[in-house]
Each structure stands twice: as structure tokens, then as C-alpha cells.
């Protein structure tokens, strides 16, 4: 009985389903607009979408499953249907615009003629076939341009189109602002990053191939030693925090036994890499050896009572050493400063760059000129009627300057005037000395003392009793005479002294090349009777460097503070790691 009831129920289920299912609507999706709608169950493969009014009914081949009358309709389909007629009363500017086609507008804002022209353009573009397939885009653009020129919009529709474009531009202008803001933000960020990179000048793996290979070896060794300490602590505590591979678990106990040797190798390798490094030393480079020494000391400590604490300290040192090794290997560094020799000529703080050195160089140059003149005057030091020296006897430093025709003429005229003044001077005026002329001789002695120095006399010293122009008062390097030597003339030089002073007063013109060579004889003879003077060396010229001592002291104090704070943070982190390992792996 029960079996018959079960068979009857099973047989009645399909019958009930076929009877009830057609009465329930099913949900379908339009193939064109992708919108869902509910239709009768029998029409699930042949329905018209209420949204897009398209027929949905297809065969297995993808064709329609019935004949569609619209496919055989020859009337061209209009993409823009004309709307309702507006009132005859002009309400807008476009309606009051005269002299244009006032045809009724469609729903898109264009008149019927312009809509027809746009439809023709679309059809012709769809039927376009290029002559050359390689120039398909160029030919299409030319063809479209010709069609738009042929079917132009009327003035009314042209204004309507421009108004619509301006309205859309105002409506969506915020999108352009957002675009420009994003572009500016991204560009400024990239520029800042590039500028910071150029300013910092930090480079990855710039220490050299040998140094980077040693750093990488230190990193690998530190990681292996850290895993060995973790495995030892796990086995000692009976916990399993990290599941390591079986092969690695077999090797790590052997590595832990030789932890002292591995730490020593890491320490030695790090020192060798530091000496061969082409970059600057950083803080991890200084902290890593300290931690390695501490780890080696924990290995040397052997006490049963402190075995657990020593293991925790050893694990903390291994973990922190791994972190520092990663920082040493992977962080960018600045390169070392280029070593440049401190040459006297090129150094900014050398003696050659000071005014004293410039004057001393001018002093030596003038002394060489006077020595050259002395060698010429040794031939006839007391013959005023001697012929003037030739131009080729001038020193080499002035030969290039005085080889021009203008300077040669000036020098020859000066020599002639000097020789005439020697020949026309009376002898009694030279032999006797009148003591009433003491005041004039005092001024002449000042000029003579200026002339007796090793510097080439300046314009002010050579024309002290003459009227000078503004061009002659222009300062020169020769006037920077720091060796202020004033020696009184002895009595034995009274004849030469009066002779040079009187000749200076009677000489009408002066040259920029110093006194005439006939006047240098007294200076040469005077050098035999003058006692050599001790030249005092100038003070230190490195004053600009010493002035920075205060700033360097302040910056050094700040550096000491920063280093102290960093060391304190390192030890605080180390103590926290020791406490963490102690809490995790301490036995109850």
C-alpha cells in the first residue's frame, strides 16, 4: 500500500508541474538593452522588450525565429523624429533671429532639413570604402569633411549647436578642473621626488661590487643564525611558533653550535666591507659590530643558572643583527666626497688668493724689472751722455707690451728728453747744496724714499709735486705697497739725490713704466750702503676658516645629542626584545 502511494505521488509531480508552470510568469533579459522583464512562460523566447521595443526571439543559429516586417520596410529610418510645433510667439533669441531658416525644430534642437542632412552624412559615411586600405583614416576624414561642407547646418541650428556646446562645457567644467588639479598634483609630486633624489644623491648598491658582495654575505649569515636561534628557543620551550622545513630543522642545530664562529665571520666581513666601501658610513654600520661583539660574549658565557637568559639575549642580538644587516645592505647611501689636492693656486684659502699675496707677487715682478735695469746700468753707471738703451733690452715681461708703435714712440721720446736734461744741467747747481732749500728737499726725500723701495713707483709717488689728472689718480696694483719702507738719505748720496730730484722737477712727462733707466743708478749704488731689512711675515690668512669654529661647535653638539638619542632608542628596543623572548619561552 505504501509503495503504491509513493509511486502515485512520483507520477503526479510532472503532471502538476506542467499544469501550474505556464500560469507563472518568468523573468527574462533583453539581448539589446540588457534590462530584465517578466513575460509569460510560453513567450520566454519570443517577446518584445518594453524598454527598447526590440523583438527577442532567436534560433540556435542566432537568427530571428520569425519574420520581422520592419526588415523589409523601404522607408529610411529617421534617427531624430521631429517634435511638436512651438507657438508662433517668439520667446527666445533664436526665434527672433531674422534672415534664417525658421523651419520647425526637432527634439534634438535641429530643424528637419539639418536632421536630414545629418542623416545623409551618416549613411554615406557608413557606406564609405577607401581607395587605399593603408590610408583608411585619412581618406575617411577627407570624405567626412567634404560631406559636412556639402550639408552644412543652417545659421539657426549652428547657433543652437554652439550654445549646446557652451552649456555642456559649463556643466562639466568641474571635470576639467579636477583633471588639471590631478595632473598638477601628480606632476608636482613627481618633480618633488626627483628634486629630492637629486638633492639627496643617495644610490642603491653604490659601494662597489666587493663591498656589496660582502654585505650580502653578512645578510645571509645573519638570517641563518637568526633562524637557528629561533629553532633552539622553540625546542627548548616545547612550542612551535614557526614551522620550518624538515631539511632546515636538521641543519639549524649544527649552525647554532658554531654561532660564535659565524658571529666572528660576520664581524670580520663587515669590517672589511667598511674599509672597501665607496659610500659614507651610516648608523647601522656602527651599531652592527657592537651587537656582534655582544652576541659573541653571550656565547662565551657558560652558566647553567643563566642559560635561559643567555639564550634569550643571544636570540635578541641575532634578530637585531639581521635587521641591521638588511639596513646596511638594502638602504641607499651617499657616495664619499671626492678628494681634491689643496693646490696653492686653486685653493680658495691659499695665500695666493689674498691681497697680500697679490702685492707680494707685484713686488717680486718689480724687483725683477729693477734687477734687469741694474744689469744694464753696470756697463756705464755714471755716463750721462751715454746713448739711450735699445728697445730689445727691456725685460721679457714688458717686451710684449712695449712692442707696439705707440709705446715705442713714447719710450723713445722719454729717453730723448732725459738725455737733454742731463746735457743742459749746470755743474755748479749739482756740486753745491743750499741749506735754505730744506723744505723742498724734504718733499723730494719722501719721493726718493718711495722710489727706493722694491715696488714699481705709483703715479702718486712719481708726480707728488705735479698737478695730476683724474685718469692718473686711478688706483693700480702698484699702489698697493704694503712694505712701507722709508729710509733717510745719507749725506754721501747728496749729489745723486739732488740730481734725481732736480731732474724729476724738470722732466715734463712721465711714463707708466717707472723712472728712466739713467735714474736707477743711484738706487743701485744706494743698495750697497743700506742695511737689509727684516721682512715680517704676515699673519695667518686662514681667518675665514677659524671664524667658523663657533658654528662647527654648535653643529657638533647637536650631532652628539642625536647620536645619543639614537643609541638610547637602540638599547630600549633591545631590552624590549629580550623581555618579549623571555615572556614567550620561559618555562613554567
Curated annotation (Swiss-Prot):
GO cellular component, one term: nuclear inner membrane
Keyword Transmembrane listed: yes
Recorded phenotype for the gene knockout or disruption: Nuclear migration defects in hyp7 hypodermal precursor cells.
Biased composition (Low complexity): 384-396
Highest taxon above the source species: Eukaryota
Chief subcellular location: nucleus
Pfam families assigned to the protein according to its UniProt record, in alphabetical order: Ima1_N
Transmembrane segments: 213-233, 255-275, 281-301, 310-330, 565-585
Annotated spans, Disordered: 378-457
Nuclear side: 1-212, 276-280, 331-564
GO terms classed as biological process: embryo development ending in birth or egg hatching; nuclear migration along microtubule
Bias-annotated ranges (Polar residues): 418-430, 441-452
Keywords noted in UniProt: Membrane, Nucleus, Transmembrane, Transmembrane helix
Single GO MF annotation: actin filament binding
Signal peptide as annotated in the record: none
Localisation per UniProt entry: Nucleus inner membrane
Bilayer topology annotation: Multi-pass membrane protein
Residues in the Perinuclear space compartment per record: 234-254, 302-309, 586-588
Family under the similarity heading: Belongs to the TMEM201 family.
Functional description taken from the UniProt entry: Plays a role in nuclear migration in hypodermal cells.
PANTHER family: TRANSMEMBRANE PROTEIN 201
Protein name (record): Transmembrane protein 201 homolog
Organism: Caenorhabditis elegans
Amino acid at each position: 500500500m505504501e509503495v503504491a502511494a509513493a509511486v502515485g505521488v512520483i507520477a503526479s509531480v510532472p503532471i502538476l508541474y506542467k499544469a501550474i508552470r505556464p500560469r507563472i510568469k518568468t523573468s527574462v533579459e533583453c539581448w539589446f538593452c540588457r534590462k530584465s522583464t517578466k513575460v509569460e512562460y510560453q513567450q520566454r523566447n519570443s517577446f518584445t522588450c518594453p524598454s527598447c521595443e526590440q523583438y527577442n526571439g532567436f534560433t540556435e543559429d542566432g537568427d530571428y525565429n520569425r519574420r520581422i516586417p520592419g526588415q523589409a520596410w523601404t522607408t529610411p529610418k529617421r534617427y531624430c523624429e521631429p517634435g511638436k510645433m512651438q507657438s508662433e510667439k517668439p520667446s527666445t533669441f533664436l526665434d527672433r533671429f531674422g534672415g534664417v531658416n525658421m523651419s520647425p525644430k526637432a527634439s534634438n534642437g535641429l530643424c528637419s532639413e539639418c536632421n536630414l542632412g545629418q542623416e545623409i552624412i551618416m549613411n554615406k559615411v557608413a557606406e564609405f570604402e577607401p581607395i587605399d586600405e593603408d590610408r583608411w583614416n585619412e581618406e575617411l576624414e577627407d570624405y567626412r569633411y567634404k560631406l559636412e561642407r556639402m550639408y552644412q547646418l543652417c545659421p539657426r541650428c549652428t547657433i543652437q549647436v554652439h550654445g549646446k556646446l557652451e552649456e555642456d562645457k559649463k556643466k562639466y567644467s568641474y571635470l576639467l578642473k579636477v583633471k588639471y588639479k590631478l595632473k598638477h598634483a601628480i606632476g608636482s609630486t613627481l618633480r618633488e621626488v626627483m628634486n629630492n633624489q637629486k638633492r639627496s644623491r643617495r644610490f642603491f648598491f653604490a659601494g662597489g661590487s666587493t663591498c656589496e658582495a660582502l654585505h650580502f654575505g653578512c645578510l645571509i649569515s645573519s638570517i641563518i643564525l637568526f633562524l637557528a636561534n629561533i629553532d633552539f628557543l622553540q625546542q627548548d620551550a616545547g612550542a612551535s611558533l614557526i614551522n620550518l622545513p624538515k631539511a632546515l630543522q636538521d641543519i639549524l642545530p649544527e649552525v647554532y653550535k658554531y654561532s660564535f664562529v659565524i658571529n666572528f665571520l660576520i664581524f670580520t666581513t663587515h669590517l672589511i666591507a667598511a674599509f672597501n666601501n665607496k659610500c659614507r658610513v651610516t648608523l647601522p654600520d656602527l651599531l652592527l659590530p657592537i651587537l656582534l661583539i655582544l652576541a659573541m660574549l653571550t656565547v662565551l658565557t657558560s652558566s647553567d643558572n643563566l642559560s635561559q637568559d643567555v639564550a634569550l639575549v643571544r636570540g635578541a642580538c641575532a634578530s637585531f643583527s639581521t635587521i641591521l644587516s638588511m639596513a646596511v645592505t638594502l638602504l641607499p647611501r651617499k657616495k664619499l666626497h671626492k678628494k681634491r689636492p689643496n693646490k696653492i693656486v686653486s685653493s680658495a684659502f691659499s695665500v695666493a688668493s689674498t691681497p697680500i699675496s697679490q702685492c707680494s707677487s707685484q713686488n717680486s715682478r718689480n724687483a725683477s724689472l729693477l734687477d734687469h735695469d741694474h744689469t744694464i746700468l753696470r756697463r756705464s753707471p755714471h755716463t750721462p751722455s751715454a746713448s739711450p738703451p735699445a728697445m730689445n733690452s727691456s725685460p721679457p715681461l714688458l717686451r710684449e707690451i712695449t712692442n707696439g708703435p705707440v709705446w715705442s714712440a713714447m719710450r723713445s721720446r722719454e729717453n730723448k728728453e732725459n738725455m737733454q736734461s742731463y746735457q743742459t744741467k749746470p755743474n755748479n747747481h749739482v756740486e753745491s747744496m743750499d741749506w735754505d732749500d730744506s723744505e723742498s728737499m724734504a718733499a723730494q726725500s719722501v719721493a726718493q724714499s718711495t722710489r727706493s723701495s722694491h715696488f714699481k713707483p705709483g703715479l702718486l709717488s712719481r708726480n707728488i709735486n705735479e698737478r695730476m689728472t683724474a685718469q692718473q689718480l686711478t688706483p693700480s696694483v702698484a699702489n698697493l705697497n704694503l712694505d712701507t719702507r722709508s729710509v733717510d738719505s745719507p749725506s754721501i748720496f747728496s749729489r745723486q739725490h739732488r740730481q734725481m730730484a732736480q731732474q724729476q722737477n724738470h722732466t715734463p712727462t712721465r711714463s707708466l713704466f717707472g723712472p728712466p733707466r739713467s735714474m736707477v743708478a743711484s738706487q743701485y749704488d744706494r743698495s750697497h750702503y743700506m742695511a737689509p731689512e727684516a721682512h715680517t711675515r704676515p699673519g695667518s690668512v686662514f681667518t675665514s676658516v677659524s671664524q667658523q669654529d663657533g658654528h662647527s661647535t654648535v653643529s657638533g653638539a647637536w650631532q652628539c645629542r642625536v647620536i645619543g638619542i639614537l643609541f638610547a632608542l637602540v638599547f630600549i628596543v633591545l631590552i624590549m626584545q629580550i623581555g618579549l623572548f623571555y615572556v614567550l619561552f620561559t618555562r613554567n
